[in-house]
C-alpha cells in the first residue's frame, strides 16, 4: 500500500533509520503515531474483538521497532462526527453511556506484566501462532 498502516510499520521504521532522514544525519527524529487507532465498524462481538486484536497487533509491532516511539490513541470515546468508531469506549450517549469496549481493557493491559497473557487471546484472530516473527525484514 502507498500508506503507512499498522501492518507495514516496518517501512516507516526503515525510513526513519536512514541517515538522510535523521537530524544532521545522525540523530533519530521522534516518530509518534498520533490520532491513530483501530476501529470497530459496529458494536457486534466480532467487530469489537477485531478492534482489540488490531490494537494488540499494532502495540506489539510498535514496541519492537526502534524507529517508532509510541502511539497516541485517537480518542477515548467513539464520536458520531468522526465517521469511524475509533474510541476505546462506546458512544457516550443515553444508549451506550460510554461503556468500555474490549479494546479498552486491552489498552489497559499494554505495557504491564499482564500484557503477554492477555494479548495471547488475539493470536488466533490475527492468524498467527505467536508474536515472534511479527516484524518483517525490509531490505
Residue ranges and their predicted role:
Residues 1-45:
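Noncatalytic carbohydrate-binding groove/subsite architecture in carbohydrate-active enzymes
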Amino acid at each position: 500500500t502507498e500508506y503507512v498502516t499498522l501492518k507495514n510499520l516496518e517501512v516507516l521504521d526503515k525510513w526513519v533509520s536512514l541517515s538522510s532522514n535523521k537530524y544532521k544525519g545522525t540523530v533519530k527524529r521522534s516518530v509518534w503515531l498520533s490520532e491513530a487507532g483501530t476501529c470497530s465498524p459496529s458494536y457486534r462481538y466480532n467487530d469489537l474483538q477485531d478492534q482489540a486484536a488490531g490494537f494488540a497487533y499494532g502495540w506489539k509491532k510498535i514496541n519492537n521497532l526502534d524507529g517508532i516511539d509510541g502511539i497516541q490513541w485517537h480518542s477515548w470515546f467513539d464520536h458520531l462526527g468522526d465517521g469511524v468508531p475509533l474510541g476505546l469506549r462506546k458512544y457516550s450517549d443515553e444508549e451506550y453511556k460510554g461503556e468500555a469496549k474490549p479494546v479498552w481493557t486491552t489498552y489497559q493491559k499494554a505495557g504491564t506484566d499482564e500484557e503477554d497473557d492477555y494479548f495471547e487471546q488475539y493470536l488466533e484472530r490475527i492468524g498467527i501462532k505467536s508474536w515472534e516473527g511479527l516484524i518483517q525484514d525490509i531490505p
